[in-house]
Amino acid sequence: MSVKREYPLKMYRNIGIMAHIDAGKTTTTERILFYTGKTHKIGETHDGAATMDWMVQEQERGITITSAATTCIWKDHVINVIDTPGHVDFTVEVERSLRVLDGAVTVLTAKGGVEPQTETVWRQADKYKVPRMAYVNKMDIMGADFFRVVNMMRERLHANAVPIQIPIGAEDTFKGYVDLIRNEAIIYEDDLGTVMDTEEIPEDMKDIAEEYRGAMIEAIVELDEELMMKYLEGEEISVEELDLALRKGVLANKIVPVMCGSSYKNKGVQPMIDAIVKYLPSPLDIPPVKGTHPETGEEVERKASDDEPMSTLAFKIATDPFIGKLAFVRVYSGVMKNGTYVLNPVKGKRERIGRLVKMHANHREEVEELHAGDLGAVVGLKDTITGDTLCDEKEPVILEKMEFPEPVISIAIEPKTKAGQEKMGLSLAKLAEEDPTFRTFTNQETGQTIIEGMGELHLEVIVDRLQREFKVECNVGKPQVAYKETIKKAVKAEGKFVRQSGGRGQYGHCWIEMTPHEGEYEFQNAIVGGAIPKEYIPAIDHGIEEASDSGVIAGYPVINFKVKLYDGSYHDVDSSEMAFKIAGSMAFKNAMSKADPVLLEPVMKVEVVVPEEYMGDVMGDINSRRGRIDGMEATAGAQNIRAFVPLSQMFGYATVLRSRTQGRGNYSMEFDHYEEVPKSIQEEIIGERMK
């Protein structure tokens, strides 16, 4: 029997809170939960007691790592809040949550404004066309400047940022804001932010309020022709008309309303929740989700409605200490019911829905069904991993796959005791299920277990979780860079594998052309006249692909090449798949050694923010790390230096920067591209590798 939907779809808001690390995102989310009545005591990130940050490592570091999806109710609306991490090592979590939310609130700090990670997250939100609004937090701290932040948003994010509030006071005198839409002042009387007075705009602010209100109305009427005409004819635009036009503009990604507050001091949070309801989209406001039919490959559309066939995306897998594997899902269409069977078309397997839960930040509510627009978690799935679709067996669809970046850093890891080996292997496999940018494999030559990830912090957190959650004590090696190899010119080469000594022989023979090529490995079969029988062709392809795991320079994976198989020969009796696989790998090795092979290294995009007086010193240091300065700009009393630096030169940089700037500099980096390693350094790397 179907449970009736409690709230209509148009009352749903699935939103993410995005920000730079330390912008106060978790505190802001906490306050939303507090005011919507889900939390009785406010959790402070400073005490490590925040409700959203439920993993121990997050509570220690005061940063958010796991995006938890939380449901709360505000003024008859259902708000599902997806908490996204702001640290660049966890960009994949941000991408993943952006994929399943409909709108977002970007939290900026009144002092730092648009910081490096804000830009990264903003670009990701642009990619997924997520409508968003901005909230300038920490208005109470030294150096808070709301108007500078709005200008930074326009310059650095190219956003049409339009304040719909302006602050009254700043730093320790911050006490409220002017609501530009309603043209009134709101003053906070207490520290819990629950007592507010609506007053007339203070005398000394009337001029600036009028100026900003005029600019806001102009920006809003530009989005609506009828209002534009009315405005040009000098008529008054009502509050309702402004709200409606602003909502339309936000949904079309044409305008970003900006608000202000201090979440820590409980000021400005409720108006922000009101704005989420007023201006951000419901699932009905966004285009229907598109996917492909697993058999025909045709495009399929699913509208947000309970009457459509069920389609759901698993956007996060988490291991819960009490109930095992949890799959966080977003239901796009139809109804997912407890105890039923569904299809995972990506894996081609049926899955049984064990239990359905709606998550509050750290407690869960069991439900019978999840409806279109809902976010929740499923217990009991066996084969489903992040990015998989779950759908109605009779109406299969694969919702678009999410693409995840390649890992750039690796470390060797070993258990402290022999007995821990198997347990470590199983635990690492579980962690890899949760996080597609984390990989684990065994190095065939040394027998070591290697883990790969997006940065030092990423791998630190993984090792930490191994020890805490899975109780595996382990030792880790020094971080290693994920070098790659490639070729610079096209060549032809032969691979011939012949064995004729007693018993059945082996015979495989092929000619290939290997060419540099940006992108994934491609294999083209250009054999004519049956020089090699069809059934042996895939074996050659496999042989080449396997051989490319270890290049000829220093045994690193080979990328950016394609292969054309154009000739060869076979033996009626002695040829086999195995022989052709070996011939393929021999041809690959021969071709690569003649094709000007080079070593590639990951180059990071680095942003360093330092006080003016340390700039020369820090830039000199970047140059000494083979860095290439890409530009700089002055921000409040500091310089923002942008540069490209090889990852191998960035290990331990945090400590160096701290000592060079007496703890006042900070930096962030993300992977940008692969680049050829200079010859002299290539020799060093090969020497190290051969030790």
From Swiss-Prot:
Residues given in the record as GTP binding sites: 19-26, 83-87, 137-140
GO biological process: ribosome disassembly
Main location group: cytoplasm
Keyword Protein biosynthesis tagged: yes
Entry-linked InterPro entries: EFG_II, EFG_III, EFG_III/V, EFG_IV, EFG_V, EFG_V-like, EFTu-like_2, G_TR_CS
Compartment(s) where it occurs, according to its Swiss-Prot or TrEMBL record: Cytoplasm
Keywords assigned by UniProt, alphabetized: Cytoplasm, Elongation factor, GTP-binding, Nucleotide-binding, Protein biosynthesis
PROSITE patterns hit by this protein: G_TR_1 (PS00301), G_TR_2 (PS51722)
Domain tr-type G: 10-284
Family: Belongs to the TRAFAC class translation factor GTPase superfamily. Classic translation factor GTPase family. EF-G/EF-2 subfamily.
Protein name: Elongation factor G
Organism: Clostridium tetani (strain Massachusetts / E88)
Underlying gene: fusA
